[in-house]
């Protein structure tokens, strides 16, 4: 599956209809959630998706405005509630903090989905059932068989069409090169080849602008036009940061997938790492798991292999002889007292990560040569 995302340019009337559709979806979401919540609290059992689908027919009779939204769109809303409850019960059974599904407040529902019908992409634009033909900026063709279409609103009010398509894999030429990747803050990533990727620090580079905009927002009175405009400025800065971060991750993941047949990452528990208050902002800004996710799906389509491994001791262990060498974070060079290997500590970790990944694939890994006596 591959997603193709395009900007929409709805007219003023179409924008009103799109917002109305989101509000109808939000109502159905909250109504479905409330119904399932009551069933769970009073009877101790969950309602099925089939049960709530039947209720949708009753709701349409009592609320005629629901008929103005395509039936598949409303069914998908109930599927989202069902997924939220499945995740809730899965966490409950696993003994984790379950996190009960939440109701959506006004303006807190930002997408709706058509499943194979209710829309048509043509030369004149994107025709949406009950809404009309919306102008779409097709900067590249939609490839493959369209499975679903999601209409999405971002935080600053822009609209997008996201087509999920069934696309035939396009394998690249066979490539036996393998690389290990050590993610970091000083350098965004260090490869086992020794190459370093500088940290773009998208949030840090926009932090002053964001702080200034947030101060102005906090001074604006609640419910005023000024406050609404100030909030949009803040949202726009957040959106700009997110877009730059995504573009960077897409470009870097594409470069790696084109260059290597096997890519090994360390398995990162970002939630746990964010507990370090000194590094939390930098870790959040790096968004390493986003890069790993982008690399993984690109690799699957290209016939490449992505492996994640437990990074435990990869910074301490000598990649040449296996000796554990203790060093503080301030020490940037790995120097082994046993074999004499001396190299950048992050590259040493990346080589160890590569070794673990190849080992999991049943492939022998040649350690770097000792530099003892140099």
Language-model-detected regions and their locations in the chain:
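Gly/serine-rich nucleotide phosphate-binding loop at the start of the catalytic core
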Residues: 1-74
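Positively charged, helix-rich recognition surfaces that bind polyanionic ligands
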Residues: 3-5, 16, 130, 140-145, ...
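Long, hydrophobic, amphipathic alpha-helical segments used as structural scaffolds
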Residues: 33, 37-40, 85-96, 167
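Acidic carboxylate diad motif detector
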Residues: 50-154, 285
């Amino acid at each position: 599956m591959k997603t193709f995302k395009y900007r929409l340019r709805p007219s003023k009337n179409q924008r009103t209809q799109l917002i109305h559709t989101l509000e109808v979806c939000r109502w159905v979401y909250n109504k479905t959630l409330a119904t399932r919540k009551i069933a769970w609290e009073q009877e101790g059992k969950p309602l099925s998706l089939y049960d709530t689908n039947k209720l949708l027919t009753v709701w349409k009779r009592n609320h005629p405005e629901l008929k103005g939204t395509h039936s598949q769109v409303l069914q998908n809303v109930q599927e989202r509630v069902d997924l939220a409850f499945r995740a809730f019960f899965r966490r409950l059974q696993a003994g984790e903090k379950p996190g009960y599904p939440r109701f959506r407040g006004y303006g807190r529902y930002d997408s709706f989905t058509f499943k194979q019908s209710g829309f048509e992409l043509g030369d004149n634009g994107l025709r949406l059932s009950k809404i009309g033909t919306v102008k779409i900026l097709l900067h590249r063709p939609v490839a493959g068989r369209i499975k679903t279409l999601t209409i999405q609103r971002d935080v600053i009010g822009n609209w997008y069409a996201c087509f999920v398509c069934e696309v035939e894999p396009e394998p690249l030429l066979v490539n036996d090169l393998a690389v290990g990747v050590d993610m970091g803050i000083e350098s965004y990533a260090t490869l086992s080849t020794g190459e370093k990727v500088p940290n773009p620090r998208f949030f840090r580079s926009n932090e002053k602008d964001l702080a200034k905009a947030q101060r102005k927002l906090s001074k604006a009175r609640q419910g005023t036009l000024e406050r609404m405009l100030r909030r949009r400025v803040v949202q726009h800065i957040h959106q700009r940061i997110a877009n730059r971060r995504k573009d960077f991750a897409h470009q870097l993941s594409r470069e790696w997938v084109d260059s290597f047949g096997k890519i090994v990452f360390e398995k990162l528990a970002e939630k746990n790492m964010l507990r370090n208050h000194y590094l939390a902002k930098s870790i959040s800004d790096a968004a390493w798991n986003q890069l790993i996710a982008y690399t993984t799906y690109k690799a699957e389509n290209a016939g490449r292999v992505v492996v994640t491994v437990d990074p435990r001791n990869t910074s301490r262990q000598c990649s040449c002889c296996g000796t554990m060498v203790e060093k503080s974070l301030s020490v940037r060079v790995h120097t082994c007292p046993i074999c004499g290997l001396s190299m950048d500590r992050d590259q040493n970790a990346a080589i160890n990560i590569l070794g673990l990944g190849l080992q999991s694939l049943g492939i022998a890994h040649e350690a770097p040569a000792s530099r003892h006596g140099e």
